Amino acid sequence: MGRRSTSSTKSGKFMNPTDQARKEARKRELKKNKKQRMMVRAAVLKMKDPKQIIRDMEKLDEMEFNPVQQPQLNEKVLKDKRKKLRETFERILRLYEKENPDIYKELRKLEVEYEQKRAQLSQYFDAVKNAQHVEVESIPLPDMPHAPSNILIQDIPLPGAQPPSILKKTSAYGPPTRAVSILPLLGHGVPRLPPGRKPPGPPPGPPPPQVVQMYGRKVGFALDLPPRRRDEDMLYSPELAQRGHDDDVSSTSEDDGYPEDMDQDKHDDSTDDSDTDKSDGESDGDEFVHRDNGERDNNEEKKSGLSVRFADMPGKSRKKKKNMKELTPLQAMMLRMAGQEIPEEGREVEEFSEDDDEDDSDDSEAEKQSQKQHKEESHSDGTSTASSQQQAPPQSVPPSQIQAPPMPGPPPLGPPPAPPLRPPGPPTGLPPGPPPGAPPFLRPPGMPGLRGPLPRLLPPGPPPGRPPGPPPGPPPGLPPGPPPRGPPPRLPPPAPPGIPPPRPGMMRPPLVPPLGPAPPGLFPPAPLPNPGVLSAPPNLIQRPKADDTSAATIEKKATATISAKPQITNPKAEITRFVPTALRVRRENKGATAAPQRKSEDDSAVPLAKAAPKSGPSVPVSVQTKDDVYEAFMKEMEGLL
């Protein structure tokens, strides 16, 4: 900090002599009082209590790091207060560091303790705030200990305590058989509960298969084993074929609990089959076999111990034929509309019905005979069913396309689900057999070609029987009928399927004429106004041919729309403005030139004044007069030169 001159201010401005004298006097006074001021500052610091300063800072910290209550003061205010208190405490430390080192050491200890407390408060505050933002599900839990705990496990068998059972699993549908075999041993070998203690309650969920097995033994009823799963048992463990379902075998045998376990699954499957007969026949096709023939087959197998049957196809085919009778074409169609796969048997039924449709045979007994023949083939040969099932899908494509059109028609609610499925259908369904499939919508009412056979071939009736009704109401038939009808089917698709029903009743009376030839009926009105609009250009083009008529027409239209009179205030001056000055000056001398000018004035005044926008007819007249004037002007110039 350099010395400043007393003759100028800080900015360098010259000072008055009086101000210069005052500044010099103050400088001397400050130099004299510097020691005194330092002593005053030290005395003020000594008057302040460092412990009180620490307590004030602790209060600020508690206020700031309080997780329960928001601080009363603003964050910025808290920082400023702490900063001032901290600076004061540091000045006191520096003062006592020079004057009294002992007090300095004590103050240093207070500062360290304060810092530790502040760190603890900050850590606790952060932990609480973080815990509020963390979700309970995101907290990782510790792994379960692998070693068994000290809890007494008396009669509850642990599945994890029998690792060998994993290797002896005979089927994926049942629990390990080894676990079942160890169950009685656990009951005898494990010590019982003390007399004063009660066993724990059953675990949540359905009873385990072991309990079902024990209950079956006590009550005395025997559950049946499905034949298909019995075949699996024979494949995996031949001992079961020899022993069968003998309950006298010791409890350690591997087949002791397996039949009951599988029986429970069988009952579940039977209940499931009752539901899936209507919805998903493909996935549970095998379970259809076991529902009716289960008791019969199991009773026979109980009587004969050796009942290894690797080819149990007749039973399956019998049940499948039963299923074929149960699954009607209506159900197959509903399954197809629901987006589910149709069981192969249902498709075969459709195949038979379609063959009869194509032959147009009104005899329903032919269908029964064909089904009986199919039954006999399936009974005689097990592989015939597999081959027929493999051949059914390719042949069942036309039925889905041919039987589909009747569906949209029957109920008013039918069309909504039908359009999304039908658009791809008609093009593929019409080529193979237009007579059987499309006729309900395409044939006139006088051709009941298929309406007789359809109700008889398809027992349910309503879906196939309704097609005779739709022809009077075209909306249901519009989606599948674009190729034959042409224009009419293209109009409905933009509208939603629910709109067509009101058309016949409400909109038909006024719209009957245009609906038949829709495009020809709609377009003729448009050409009628067009000739009136397009007739103007020919008239305009023809107008220049007749100057008088064109001028008259232009004047009439111009007066109606645009008035060009204000454009020419002085006709003579405006017309002769572009004429050379020589012509204007010497106009009285040259009578020949004046006459054409007057003529041009008279001729061009009318078109310029009244028909300025349409200058077509007036152009030739003005051009001719100007040419005459120009020729006269050139002659005059030649005479002058």
UniProtKB/Swiss-Prot annotation:
A GO term for molecular function: RNA binding
Region (Disordered): 1-37, 186-213, 236-552, 587-623
Pfam families cross-referenced by the UniProt entry: Wbp11
Region (Required for nuclear import): 1-45
Residue numbers of N6-acetyllysine PTMs: K13, K565
Acidic residues bias: start-end ranges: 253-263, 351-365
Location in or out of the cell: Nucleus; Cytoplasm
Motif annotated as PGR, chain positions: 455-466
Modified residues (Phosphotyrosine): Y236
Residue ranges, compositional bias (Basic and acidic residues): 276-304, 366-380
Keyword Cytoplasm tagged: yes
Cross-link Glycyl lysine isopeptide (Lys-Gly) (interchain with G-Cter in SUMO2) placement: K557, K572
GO biological process, one term: rRNA processing
Bias kind Basic residues: ranges: 28-37
Coiled coil feature spans: 75-133
PANTHER family: WW DOMAIN-BINDING PROTEIN 11
Disease linkage: Vertebral, cardiac, tracheoesophageal, renal, and limb defects: An autosomal dominant disorder with incomplete penetrance and variable expressivity, characterized by cardiac, vertebral, tracheo-esophageal, renal and limb defects. Some patients also exhibit craniofacial abnormalities.
Protein's job: Activates pre-mRNA splicing. May inhibit PP1 phosphatase activity.
Protein name, as recorded: WW domain-binding protein 11
Natural source organism: Homo sapiens (Human)
